[in-house]
Amino acid sequence: MMKTTYSLGEAIEIGIDEAGRGCFWGPICAGAVIWPPEEEWTEEYREVTPQIKDSKKLSEKKRVAVESAIKALAIDWGIGLVDASEIDENGMTWANQEAFRRAIAACSSGLEPDLLLIDGVLGLPMGDVKYECIPGGDGLYLPIAAASILAKVGRDRWVTEWVNSSDKHKEVAARYDLLNNKGYGTAKHRDGLKAHGAHGMHRGQFIRNWL
């Protein structure tokens, strides 16, 4: 079973993770989750918690179901998006950190975190708030795993809703197989770039070798 907290005591810890960092197209998305300590769990928490895992280890259907439970049970949660134009203008490190900031800002409870638990090696200076970078944290700490699910499902949902919002968007998606690859650089996506060139929501720095 994953750990629910990093430190002892009553520190407010927020788990943070991202999805879409390596995509060719579309935004990077971050999730942020504050999960209650184990001593506060009801039976409902005990049923849901074993299902919260690194998002990559869950099927799409399972991720969506668990995402709903996380949103219902978390003390607080938020999602932050940074689009492709911002990534091209400011670079991926900035974009990744900005997605983290936006996810934290989207939390609505008003609680001020004492500690950020961040998956990976990229820190996030935020004044007096401490942070811990934890490689593989989405497989070790429950709040990070929950954040990884929110980020993955949130980004996939954003792509699907964008595609289905107009016939023009559906035509764009068909060129690059976006509904299936969600913007990642699959073989079909690369073939689409060679055949049609770039779309306005492609990340220029990511695709230059495929044009």
Region spans (language model):
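RNase H-like, Mg2+-dependent phosphodiesterase core
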Residues: 1-211
